[in-house]
UniProtKB/Swiss-Prot annotation:
It comes from Mycobacterium leprae (strain TN). Homodimer. This is D-inositol 3-phosphate glycosyltransferase. InterPro entries: Glyco_trans_1, Glyco_trans_4-like_N, Mycothiol_biosynthesis_MshA. Keywords: Glycosyltransferase, Magnesium, Metal-binding, Transferase. NCBIfam families: mycothiol_MshA.
């Protein structure tokens, strides 16, 4: 696997680390449990990063030195793709030919390197975009920076070259087809999974006590990177209209605009709700489950979201979700059953949606909503994701092998007989 711009070992909620990190790591771990050896190549971001990290039996992370360890923005990473690709190719060269059977690249930067590796190693390239520039640019938040044309060009190249594409939802498949003219026959859907052993219902009062929150009252949680794309400000602005609501924000800075906790702290002060907002740093997976268990509902107001893993993890804990009706969130959340979908980012509409869902969650329907959320989340197990990944890999290998054999047959059929000409003065 290739994950250039962010390590699967990074703490989600910090910098560029988020759902993709969880996806790469968990899919690798579950593939290894099926007997598939997985090596993940990522860019080293600190001098202390060891070249090799054994995460679990069958899962190896290779930290490739490509560019400076610090101060390199994600938008500058295209300048380091040559260095990263060199590190990947050198690692393969240390093995016997044919060591790798398939390349699975994540995000367009990795796809550029995967394209080269595919051609050098003669193995199929499977690519997961995770997000698309055109989709993000069509729904920019105030203060967010547009994705550069370079990315759109790079994404198109990867789509053209990939042997198969794996997407999170049918909606993402339609986007690939309409925006990048992807071949529908080469697209497979594999919903991201959730760790159902870790994310499960728990005692709400105990969870609140563990986080130092008041045991009574309504709590709405926002979990994710603090950036305009994720729209944490919408949650605070909605809370300003709901005096009975306490907000928990768990995440670290990323992106531009309102991209720092300090920015949200100032916004809370301006709105006069500082006493009702608790800011937490990015949480470990175990602590994240505690946050979900402590909340009456979880808000996911993103402007674009290819899936929305946080929404599924929250529901696995029995907590309903109010989410923006964008991207994969209508798949992650069953509107009117496990939560509420909100169209647009009008603060008044969000305040109404939060208020109504809180009332339902506190009424006679509370148990039914919680149970429905758990049942819905159960279909997004990592075992199901792994089944879908393996099916896609098999198709990729089968199609790639058949194509190569067909090309060899065509080459043999069209090759002209070779004529051997003896030159005067040469021995027999």
């Amino acid at each position: 696997m290739l994950a250039v711009h962010t390590s699967p070992l990074a703490q989600p909620g910090i910098g560029d680390a988020g759902g993709m990190n969880v996806y790469v790591l968990q899919s690798a771990l579950h593939l290894a449990r099926r007997g598939i050896e997985v090596e993940i190549f990522t860019r080293a971001t600190a001098s202390a990063d060891p070249p090799i990290v054994w995460v679990a039996p069958g899962v190896l992370v290779r930290n490739v030195v490509a560019g400076p360890f610090e101060g390199l923005d994600k938008y500058d990473l295209p300048t380091q793709l040559c260095a990263f690709a060199a590190g990947v190719l050198r690692a393969e060269a240390a093995h016997e030919p044919g060591y790798y059977d398939i390349v699975h690249s994540h995000y367009w930067l990795s796809g550029q390197v995967g394209w080269l590796a595919r051609d050098r190693w003669a193995v199929p390239l499977v690519h997961t975009a995770h997000t698309l520039a055109a989709v993000k640019n069509a729904a920019l938040a105030d203060g967010d920076a547009a994705e550069p044309p370079l990315r759109s060009v790079g994404e198109q190249q990867v789509v053209d070259e990939a042997d198969r594409m794996i997407v999170n939802t049918d909606d993402e498949a339609r986007q690939l087809i309409s925006i990048h003219r992807a071949d529908p026959a080469k697209i497979d859907v594999a919903h991201p999974g959730v760790d159902l052993d870790m994310f499960r219902p728990g005692d709400r009062r105990a969870a609140r006590a563990a986080l130092g929150l008041p045991l009574d009252g309504n709590v709405v949680a926002f979990v994710g990177r603090i950036q305009p794309l994720k729209a944490p400000d919408i949650v605070l602005r909605a809370a300003a209209k709901l005096p009975q609501v306490r907000i928990v924000v768990a995440g670290g800075p990323s992106g531009s605009g309102l991209a720092s906790p300090d920015g949200l702290v100032r916004l809370a002060d301006e709105l006069g709700i500082t006493a009702r907002v608790t800011f937490l740093p990015p949480q470990s997976r175990t602590n994240l489950a505690t946050v979900f268990q402590a909340a009456d509902l979880v808000a996911v107001p993103s402007y674009s979201e290819s899936f929305g893993l946080v929404a599924v993890e929250a529901q696995a804990c029995g907590t309903p979700v109010v989410a923006a009706a964008v991207g994969g969130l209508p798949v992650a959340v069953r509107d009117g059953v496990t939560g509420t979908l909100v169209f647009g980012h009008n603060v008044g509409h969000w305040a109404d949606a939060v208020d109504q869902l809180l009332r339902l969650s506190a009424g006679p329907q509370a148990r039914a909503i919680s149970r429905a959320a758990v049942v819905h989340a159960a279909q997004f197990s990592w075992d199901n994701t792994t089944d879908a990944l393996l099916a896609s890999y098999r198709r990729a290998i089968g199609d790639f092998t058949a194509t190569r054999q067909h090309r060899v047959r065509d080459l043999v059929a069209t090759r002209k007989p070779r004529r051997w000409i003896s030159r005067r003065g040469m021995g027999a």
